Amino acid sequence: MIPRKAFLTKGTGVHKDRLASFELALRDAKIEKYNLVSVSSILPPNCKLVPREEGLAELKPGAIVHCVLARNDTNEPHRLMASAIGTAVPVNEENYGYISEHHSFGEEEIIAGEYAEDLAATMLATTLGIEFDAEMAWHEREQVYKASGHIFDTFHMCQTAKGDKDGKWTTTVAAMVFVTSKC
């Protein structure tokens, strides 16, 4: 079972109950109807990245759906949190890519998103034997990775939120959702 398509999604939920907050975040991300199974960080060879609506059209309620899921929650008022997915796609579509998940507190969306993107790109770069200075800033390493001719694209999706002012549970999710076949 190798996914042939994948899509990114994100969402936020707020509720007095922690589990209900998570459910609302999944609803906001449009993936609450599925039995989600978290998997590790490999983007399969020849897996086409598609818009969320195209991917959702091939899934049916109750289906077992694999995804790389970033999830974070808090009931602390005004606490900033993030859930991010980073992706690195190789030039040669016959090779696999990497997906990373990142969950943090106190990071703005761009910081958390770029961290996840950097992590995925670095994991792919090390498997491809690309030499780089780990102390370089992300934007400098990104140029090294792309100049190598092995990494085609990197990107991220991030959901941030601040904890509900009244202390209700607030949840953020970001996910790379896989489509294996028409359900």
UniProtKB/Swiss-Prot annotation:
GO molecular function: arginine decarboxylase activity
Keywords from the UniProt entry: Decarboxylase, Lyase, Pyruvate
InterPro entries the record matches: Pyr-dep_his/arg-deCO2ase (IPR016104), Pyr-dep_his/arg-deCO2ase_sand (IPR016105), Pyruvoyl-dep_arg_deCO2ase (IPR002724)
Pyruvic acid (Ser): modified positions: 41
Site positions (Cleavage (non-hydrolytic)): 40-41
Keyword Lyase in record: yes
SUPFAM superfamilies: Pyruvoyl-dependent histidine and arginine decarboxylases
Cofactor binding notes: Binds 1 pyruvoyl group covalently per subunit.
EC number: 4.1.1.19
PANTHER family reported in the protein's UniProt record: PYRUVOYL-DEPENDENT ARGININE DECARBOXYLASE
Record's protein name: Pyruvoyl-dependent arginine decarboxylase 2
Classification of source organism: Archaea, Methanobacteriati, Methanobacteriota, Stenosarchaea group, Methanomicrobia
